[in-house]
């Protein structure tokens, strides 16, 4: 209830202002009645209206529940009643102002009360004006009776507790406002004590009010501090002025401030209605406000990037009320605002303000989007709450990070474990493969063991160790993996010497070298202990051939992966005094023994471990593996794949010691005593040569080196190790040492070096076959062989007596040496050794030229003249091939005489089991060369191992054949040696193109390559291109006989001997081969085809065929090719039947010959003539059908079909669609000759079927009679039906109207005065009549780029006029249409028409003629108006005033229902009503008794483009670039009713009005989703088309054209049986579709 002020002079209260707010449902109040005030939510000071006074409102009851109900103001149901007006005391008391903090008002009834306290005293808010100072209108004032008074003068209010405090108040207008009473200040004490004292003083809370009717959500007190943009009030009222549902925060919020905006500025207070109580929260949230506000200041300071809020008035400091608890006795009050976090206990009583809102960034944190809790408990705040929260968050974040790190570590460990397992699996697989390969190796018989090696062997070959001392140890890690009990020999005891405790081990099998162990051995050697304080635990000998070769070459032998054996005891630590012997870095501390899990390491892992093991600056860790890999490639063994060293740590000292201990083989005999000396020697030498990056250069030592002399001074400061022998328990005690490790192969290599020093040749035989590689081979042959990484160190072999090999040893004898029984050797790689021996170094012609002393050796040698090893003298590098000049030597007679005078060279001594072949020296040189060429791929060398057996057999067969040829009569040899006319040599190795003959007395030397050199060619292939040995021998006999006969009679031909020649080109080649024509066609080494004819004539041949007649075969005839060239080329010519290919080859030969600069040779002339003849031959047979191959005929037919149907392959599509339709329906037959001209396709989007053909193709391939048959069969097929439904949506005959004259021009010339009706482009209702000539001239005048800007020509009848029709009877035009292709049978009176034979002038079905200008935009603003921008900076000009002319015909169907049952021929079509008496005779076919019988008509049209005959078109007219004049959309006849229903068509209407909707792509897509099939296509000028019945179609003219169209009622439309198509017995085809071969494709 609001307080009312009274005027002292009048005694009546001032009339308040007019109330505002919603009105009651009763209507607007008047001055005589009560004025309804606003709702409880409106708190304006003028909303109070006192109750009217008068007799009608007299108070008669003394009960406060009923007496004052009629005198209360019409405020609302919650307003308490007033005392009756007849009591002046109460009225006087009512006039006094109420200043009590709480007021309790009685209820309106006995049961319902309103015990809520209302705040009646509060301060005026800043910025809000006070109430009006003017008195209200008296008409709105009704005096209220004063309330009952009490003893102290205050009005009586029942249920009021405590008693209100009253203060006299002056008049509202005259009395100044009273000062504001400040709230009581609480004593200075702690927060808890102040709260307890304040709680004890407070009166008990009133009971909770009932739930109000109008519920208004009240914001919580926190909203005034959350940066919402509304500042808190300057001063808060004391707690005593608050109710149980209010708090200081509420008063600071905007809603409570509006609720109390009626406070007067003079300090007087008025009673306000209570605010609506918000509904209690269903689930109150226990939320500490202070905890939320603790970090508010920090949050706002950090949010510097956000926009600052609008400036607001800063709140005044207010006294902090004592805190209270939610569980206190005064439970009706909400807790006051909490103490700020920085407020100390001593300052609790000081005036404080809520936290300053510097930024609104934390409002989203403090004020969530969800509903705020109604009541917030306020437990005692702690100063450390914010710190605890931060620490908790930090601990949580740290724990989360630790968890993530643990997960990452677990994943990393898992991946590492998987990688290790994968490596182990791969290692096991490789080890298994090595074991399987080793199991295949067999050892030689035991009885073939070599004798014991004597000590003098080492001194016999002092120059062997010029490069580098042998490696003093051999890795024995692969002993366990390679041992085989069944082939293992008995071990022999080892003498105790050198201070080492040696444990006898099993001999190793010869395994392929691995890359990793050489480095591991080198590292183990670098960190080898210097003192023998502890004996070695496991030292195993290495008796295999690899181990022996390794010592000789000075490299560590590759070993197999170590098995999982317990690690040996660690060796003693190295002493610092021995570190000066090797420039390596010692480990700072000894490493731990290796774990058992690391024992089974793969070779790749070991190689990776040895990459960076504290190397010395002078030691290279990359060079030895590279050389070893090349050496392994030489041996045909692929190197192991490289392995990353990421998971393979560097081997520790114990591992290196283990390698050294397990790989130290005791030397046999007395050589074991010098083991330590050899080791020391190797260390010194290794330290000097370790820093080389490329291949190691030889370091020269004294000329004669004694092993003992080397050992003594080096090891004098090192104690001699004592080697004690320890045998395995299971092995028998050997009686005497057996030289198991001495192998014949090792002895061969040692003797090879002896041969190199001893053997001297008078003059080396230099074969001139190797052009590209021979120079480098000879240059490097002089250098001493470097150490080979693939051979283990062998023990000194026994002295073997061998004879020097002569320089002229025969090739066949070398074969015999190589094929000696191999029981004398225990090597497991004998095929490799044999293969490596076969290559002999040669020099080039350029080398001989540089020397200036050509070799005068006979061109043809015998066995005893060949086989000598080449001289070690170097050869100069060859100059470029393009600048080579011919090397001339004496005549053959001189060579023959010199050969006869030359004494036979000494033969080789008998080869014993220990005598190696002298050609082993070539193998060592090859290894040296291969080490130099790092670009060679090891895969190419594996071909040697694969093809070795087959090539050796071929070599033996070739040797036998050569021996058979040598046994021939001497007469044949004399004939061959006679003088022949000078001609170019045709050798395979030396091309005569580079060395043409310049003299008749001298000829180019030719040396045929040895057959033993072929297996060594790296880029060779296994393909055989020659005959067998027996066949070659027989063929050679024929060739010799032919040559002898040719020498006597030059005219004799040997074509009959060589076999029949099929072509002139082959005949020419054979003539060149036999010597009739000179041809300089020779090939160089196929290994280097650049710059030779090898890559031109025979590009596919990478390996040369073997020669069976040796060198003399190519020398017999100067102008003939070698026999092997002849045979290989003859086979190629037989296989290659293409003449064009041979011509291309010969053209390339001629081009190459001209580039070299010898265009006048016989070869060039003959090649040019041959090319010309081949071209003539090809031209002669080009059009000869008798020689046509079936494939050629088929390809020609396919090309013709492709020409008919373009590149899209429409013939295949037509066959597929036609085959599909034939299987489903009974189609009319069509001849197979005509099917290739028919195209049947389906629209890719609409799936409707279209049939079409091209008339231009038809008239090119068919005659007049055939064309007539095709036209009738095509029309029958196009109108085919199934149960009365057409199968095709449209039929198109392209270019069929070209034979017709321009009908528009013909009408303008022949009927110029014919009146025609012309429409308008801008007004469809406007129709103009003019002569035909005028219209034609107007159209031609405005015709431009395919359209003319003139009105369309309406339909013009060509068969006469009826009623208001325009046109006439144009007989000539009708005759032209009848004679046009395809149109005769389907004219309205044609053979296929139901009314066949009627007169043309009586036809109601047409034809009609009309002209359309095409769609365009027609401007209407004239030519004077410019559309250009008026201002130069304007962005656009004015829009043109133009209108669109849509030249369209909406969807329609050329059919109607029968109008009369008695006369079936009387039907209403889309254009005319047809009535014919001539069809009455055929009425028996019609369905008279069927009232629902539908008659329909097909439509036929002819399109012609509008062209100006007098104008010259800029674009040239092409047949395939015809203008598109119509855009057609046709719907499948099966969907007739669906289309009519979807488009709301009325088929009984004319075509123009059947459908009012234009069908575009959007509608088409929608209809397609409903299953309606359609086809959208373009019709071009000079096209003809026909539309079967029941086909709804839509036309749009895109270019100016003239059209002639008519309706035709086909016979089968009126047949009750509904045949599949028209019957045409005279032109029908009785064949089925299976006669076409392409139909089933």
Swiss-Prot record:
Q: GO: which molecular function terms?
A: histone H4K20 demethylase activity; metal ion binding
Q: Where is the composition biased (Pro residues)?
A: 203-212, 272-282, 309-322, 783-801, 871-881
Q: Which residues form the JmjC domain?
A: 1431-1625
In what ranges is there compositional bias, type Polar residues? 534-551, 985-998
State where Fe cation binds: 1452, 1454, 1593
The residues listed in the UniProt record as binding 2-oxoglutarate, with positions renumbered to this chain, are 1449, 1585
Q: Where is the composition biased (Basic and acidic residues)?
A: 14-26, 62-73, 400-450, 483-495, 571-580, 829-838, 966-979, 1422-1459
Tell whether Cytoplasm is among the UniProt keywords.
Answer: no
Q: Where in the cell is it found?
A: Nucleus; Chromosome
Quaternary organization: Interacts with the dosage compensation proteins dpy-27, dpy-26 and sdc-3; the interaction is probably involved in dpy-21 recruitment to the X chromosomes in hermaphrodites. Interacts with the serine/threonine-protein kinase sgk-1.
What does the organism's lineage look like at the top? Eukaryota, Metazoa, Ecdysozoa, Nematoda, Chromadorea
Name used for this protein in its record: Lysine-specific demethylase 9
On cofactor binding, the record's note says: Binds 1 Fe(2+) ion per subunit.
The question of whether Acyltransferase is a record keyword is answered with no
Family of the protein in this entry: Belongs to the round spermatid basic protein 1 family.
Name the top EC class.
oxidoreductase
Q: Which GO terms describe its cellular component?
A: nucleus; X chromosome
Instruction: State the needed cofactors, names only.
Output: Fe(2+)
């Amino acid at each position: 209830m609001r307080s009312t002020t009274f005027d002292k002079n009048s005694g009546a209260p001032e009339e308040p202002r007019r109330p505002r707010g919603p009105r009651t449902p009763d209507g607007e109040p008047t001055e005589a009645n009560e004025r309804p005030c606003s709702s409880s939510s409106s708190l304006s000071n003028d909303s109070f209206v006192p109750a009217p006074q008068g007799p009608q409102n007299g108070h008669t009851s003394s009960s406060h529940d009923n007496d004052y109900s009629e005198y209360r103001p019409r405020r609302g149901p919650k307003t308490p009643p007033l005392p009756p007006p007849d009591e002046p005391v109460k009225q006087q008391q009512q006039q006094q102002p109420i200043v009590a903090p709480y007021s309790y008002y009685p209820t309106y009834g006995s049961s319902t009360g309103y015990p809520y306290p209302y705040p009646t005293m509060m301060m005026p808010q800043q910025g809000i004006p006070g109430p009006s100072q003017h008195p209200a209108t008296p008409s709105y004032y009704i005096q209220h009776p004063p309330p009952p008074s009490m003893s102290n003068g205050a009005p009586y209010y029942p249920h009021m507790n405590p008693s209100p405090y009253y203060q006299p108040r002056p008049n509202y207008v005259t009395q100044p406002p009273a000062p504001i009473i400040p709230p009581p200040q609480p004593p200075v004490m702690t927060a808890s004590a102040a709260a307890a004292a304040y709680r004890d003083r407070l009166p008990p809370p009133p009971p909770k009010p009932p739930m109000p009717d109008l519920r208004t959500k009240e914001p919580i007190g926190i909203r005034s501090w959350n940066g919402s943009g509304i500042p808190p009030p300057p001063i808060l009222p004391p707690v005593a002025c608050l109710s149980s549902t209010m708090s200081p925060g509420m008063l600071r919020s905007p809603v409570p401030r509006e609720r109390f905006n009626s406070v007067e500025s003079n300090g007087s207070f008025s009673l306000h209605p209570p605010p609506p109580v918000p509904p209690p929260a269903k689930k109150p949230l226990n939320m500490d406000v202070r905890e939320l506000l603790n970090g508010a200041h920090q949050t706002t300071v950090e949010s510097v990037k956000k926009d600052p809020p609008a400036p607001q008035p800063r709140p005044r400091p207010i006294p902090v009320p004592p805190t209270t608890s939610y569980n206190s006795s005064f439970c009706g009050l909400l807790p006051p605002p909490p103490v700020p976090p920085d407020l100390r206990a001593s300052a609790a009583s000081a005036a404080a303000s809520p936290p300053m809102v510097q930024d609104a960034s934390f409002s989203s944190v403090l004020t969530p989007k969800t509903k705020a809790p109604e009541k917030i408990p306020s437990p005692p705040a702690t100063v450390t709450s914010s710190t605890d929260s931060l620490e908790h968050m930090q601990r949580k974040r740290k724990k989360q990070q630790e968890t993530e790190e643990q997960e990452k570590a677990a994943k990393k460990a898992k991946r590492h474990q998987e990688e290790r397992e994968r490596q182990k699996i791969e290692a096991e697989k490789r080890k298994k493969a090595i074991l399987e390969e080793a199991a295949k190796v067999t050892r030689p018989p035991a009885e073939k063991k070599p004798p014991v090696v004597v000590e003098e062997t080492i001194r016999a070959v002092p120059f062997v160790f010029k490069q580098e001392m042998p490696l003093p140890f051999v890795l024995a890690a692969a002993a366990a993996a390679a041992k085989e009990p069944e082939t293992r020999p008995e071990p022999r005891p080892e003498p105790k010497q050198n201070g080492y405790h040696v444990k006898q081990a099993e001999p190793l099998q010869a395994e392929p070298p691995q890359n990793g162990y050489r480095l591991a051995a080198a590292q183990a050697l670098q960190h080898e202990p210097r003192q023998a304080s502890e004996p070695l635990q496991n030292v195993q000998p290495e008796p295999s051939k690899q181990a022996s070769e390794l010592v000789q070459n000075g490299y560590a032998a590759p070993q197999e992966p170590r098995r999982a054996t317990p690690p040996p005891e660690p060796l003693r630590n190295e002493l610092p005094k021995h570190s000066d012997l090797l420039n390596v870095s010692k480990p700072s501390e000894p490493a731990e023994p290796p774990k058992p899990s690391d024992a089974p390491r793969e070779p790749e892992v070991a190689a990776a471990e040895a990459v960076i093991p504290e190397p010395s600056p002078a030691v290279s860790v990359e060079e030895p593996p590279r050389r070893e890999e090349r050496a392994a490639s030489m041996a045909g063994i692929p190197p192991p794949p490289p392995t990353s060293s990421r998971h393979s740590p560097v081997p520790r000292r114990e591992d290196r010691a283990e390698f050294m201990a397990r790989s130290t083989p005791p030397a046999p005999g007395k050589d074991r005593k010098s083991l330590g000396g050899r080791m020391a020697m190797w260390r010194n030498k290794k330290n000097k040569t370790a820093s080389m990056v490329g291949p190691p250069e030889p370091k020269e030592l004294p000329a004669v080196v004694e092993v003992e002399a080397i050992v003594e001074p080096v090891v004098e400061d090192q104690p001699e190790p004592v080697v004690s022998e320890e045998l395995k328990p299971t092995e028998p005690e050997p009686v005497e040492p057996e030289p198991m490790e001495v192998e014949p192969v090792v002895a061969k290599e040692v003797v090879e070096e002896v041969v190199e020093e001893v053997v001297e040749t008078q003059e080396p035989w230099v074969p001139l076959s190797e052009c590209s590689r021979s120079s480098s081979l000879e240059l490097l042959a002089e250098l001493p062989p470097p150490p080979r990484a693939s051979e283990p160190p062998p023990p000194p072999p026994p002295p073997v007596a061998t004879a020097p090999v002569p320089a002229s040893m025969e090739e066949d004898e070398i074969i015999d040496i190589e094929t000696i029984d191999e029981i004398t050797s225990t090597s497991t790689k004998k095929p490799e050794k044999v293969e490596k021996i076969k290559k002999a170094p040669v020099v080039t012609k350029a080398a001989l030229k540089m020397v200036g002393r050509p070799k005068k050796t006979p061109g043809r040698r015998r066995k005893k003249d060949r086989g000598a090893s080449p001289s070690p003298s170097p050869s100069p590098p060859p100059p470029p091939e393009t600048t080579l000049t011919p090397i001339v030597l004496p005549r053959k007679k001189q060579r023959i005489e010199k050969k006869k005078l030359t004494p036979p060279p000494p033969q080789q001594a008998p080869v014993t089991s220990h005598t190696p072949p002298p050609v082993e020296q070539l193998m060592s040189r090859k290894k040296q060369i291969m080490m130099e060429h790092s670009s060679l791929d090891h895969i190419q060398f594996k071909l040697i191992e694969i093809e070795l057996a087959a090539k050796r057999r071929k070599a033996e067969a070739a040797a036998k054949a050569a021996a058979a040829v040598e046994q021939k009569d001497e007469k044949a040899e004399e004939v061959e040696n006679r003088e022949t006319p000078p001609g170019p040599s045709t050798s395979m190795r030396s091309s005569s193109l580079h060395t043409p003959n310049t003299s008749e007395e001298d000829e180019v030397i030719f040396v045929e390559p040895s057959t033993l050199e072929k297996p060594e060619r790296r880029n060779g292939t296994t393909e055989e291109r020659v005959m067998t040995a027996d066949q070659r021998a027989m063929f050679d006999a024929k060739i010799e006989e032919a040559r002898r006969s040719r020498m006597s009679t030059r005219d004799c031909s040997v074509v009959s001997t060589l076999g029949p020649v099929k072509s002139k080109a082959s005949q020419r080649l054979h003539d060149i081969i036999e010597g009739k024509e000179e041809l300089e066609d020779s090939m160089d080494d196929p290994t280097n085809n650049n710059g030779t004819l090898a890559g031109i004539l025979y590009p596919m041949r990478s390996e040369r065929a073997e020669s069976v007649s040796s060198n003399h075969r190519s020398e017999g005839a100067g102008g003939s090719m070698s026999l092997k060239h002849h045979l290989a080329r003859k086979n190629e010519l037989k296989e290659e039947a293409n003449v064009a290919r041979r011509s291309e080859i010969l053209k390339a030969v001629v081009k190459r010959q001209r580039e070299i600069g010898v265009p006048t040779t016989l070869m060039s002339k003959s090649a040019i003539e041959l090319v010309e003849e081949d071209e003539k031959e090809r031209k002669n047979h080009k059009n000869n059908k008798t020689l046509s191959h079936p494939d050629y005929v088929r390809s020609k037919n396919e090309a013709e079909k492709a020409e008919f149907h373009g590149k899209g392959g429409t013939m295949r599509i037509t066959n597929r669609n036609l085959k599909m339709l034939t299987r489903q329906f009974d189609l009319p037959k069509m001849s197979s000759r005509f099917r290739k001209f028919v195209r049947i396709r389906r629209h890719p989007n609409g799936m409707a079927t279209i049939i079409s053909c091209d008339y231009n193709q038809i008239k090119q391939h068919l005659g007049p009679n055939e064309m007539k048959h095709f036209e009738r069969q095509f029309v029958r097929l196009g109108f085919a039906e199934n149960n009365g439904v057409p199968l095709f949506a449209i039929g198109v005959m392209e270019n069929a109207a070209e034979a017709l004259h321009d009908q528009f021009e013909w009408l303008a010339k022949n009927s110029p005065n014919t009146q025609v009706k012309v429409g308008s482009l801008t007004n469809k209702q406007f129709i103009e009549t003019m002569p035909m000539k005028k219209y034609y001239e107007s159209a031609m005048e405005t015709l431009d780029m395919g359209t003319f800007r003139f009105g369309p020509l309406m339909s013009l009848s060509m068969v006469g006029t009826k009623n208001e029709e325009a046109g006439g009877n144009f007989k000539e035009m009708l005759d032209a249409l009848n004679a046009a292709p395809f149109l005769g049978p389907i004219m309205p009176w044609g053979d296929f028409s139901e009314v066949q034979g009627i007169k043309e002038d009586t036809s109601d079905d047409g034809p009609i003629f009309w002209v359309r200008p095409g769609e365009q935009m027609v401007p209407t603003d004239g030519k004077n108006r410019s559309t250009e921008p008026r201002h130069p900076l304007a962005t656009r000009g004015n829009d043109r005033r133009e209108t669109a002319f849509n030249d369209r015909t909406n969807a329609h169907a050329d059919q109607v229902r029968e109008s009369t049952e008695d006369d079936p021929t009387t039907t209403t079509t889309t254009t005319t009503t047809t009535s014919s008496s001539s069809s009455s005779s055929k009425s028996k076919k019609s369905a008279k008794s069927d009232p629902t019988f539908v008659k329909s008509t097909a439509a036929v049209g002819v399109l012609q483009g509008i062209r100006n005959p007098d104008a010259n078109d800029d674009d040239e007219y092409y047949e395939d670039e015809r203008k598109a004049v119509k855009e057609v959309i046709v719907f499948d006849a099966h969907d007739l009713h669906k289309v009519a229903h979807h488009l709301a068509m009325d088929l009984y209407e004319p075509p123009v009005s059947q459908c009012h909707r234009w069908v575009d792509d959007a509608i088409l897509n929608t209809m397609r989703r409903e299953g309606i099939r359609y086809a959208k296509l373009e019709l071009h000028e000079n096209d003809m088309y026909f539309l079967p019945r029941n086909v709804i179609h839509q036309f749009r003219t895109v270019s100016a054209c003239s059209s002639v169209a008519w309706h035709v009622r086909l016979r089968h439309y009126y047949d009750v049986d509904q045949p599949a198509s028209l019957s045409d017995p005279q032109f029908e085809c009785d064949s089925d579709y299976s006669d076409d071969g392409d139909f089933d494709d």
